[in-house]
């Protein structure tokens, strides 16, 4: 019989996280849950295909990077929402981190190039109907940065929890929304809407930042940090298209997509087209750099 006042420990629930390791006994493997990680690689080919393990590991690593990118993006969104100078400096710092991560993703795609196309074909059919289209974290990332496409929900029709995550991202303000709200509070012309006229006005409105950087130094840093991250994401997409074409040519994707022809349509996409377009509308440099009359 238990002593008066004592409580029996509750049985662990299925799926509950393991109890924390006592202080002072934490190991590297415990902290990083290495044993759990190593149990997650489960190739499906039978008999096993040697190269499938590489395929699984590379894509799992991408998903871990996507998780970190979402973590950083949510913090950046919060800082833009606050809008004070201290928060904007933190946003700039984190945006530079995001750009570094996105840059690191590019050579990782090249790891798959070490697999011969014929080797990939040895297990590719076993993946159907799984597809990169179903990477809900990548779709969340696109939404969080401003590329919102409700049609992507169709790829998660059989996964209600994942679909709900993407729905929340579709409804929440994106980084692009946050930037627009910030610029409007600071007196910039940033109309809402997707029309060409609204886009042109937004791009022209940013001229003030670049043509008078001494008056808008922090905003210029913010815009350039957003642009650099945007550029690295665009380069990642380009690397991805080349890798896919190198592996499967113009075949359709395992999930029924058009494969490379579809991916090529995404290459011109930008999260912040106005920052790119602002370059077109610049007419002079800062006053201190203007040539003598």
What are these regions (language model features)?
Residues 2-293:
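Surface-exposed peri-terminal alpha-helical interaction modules
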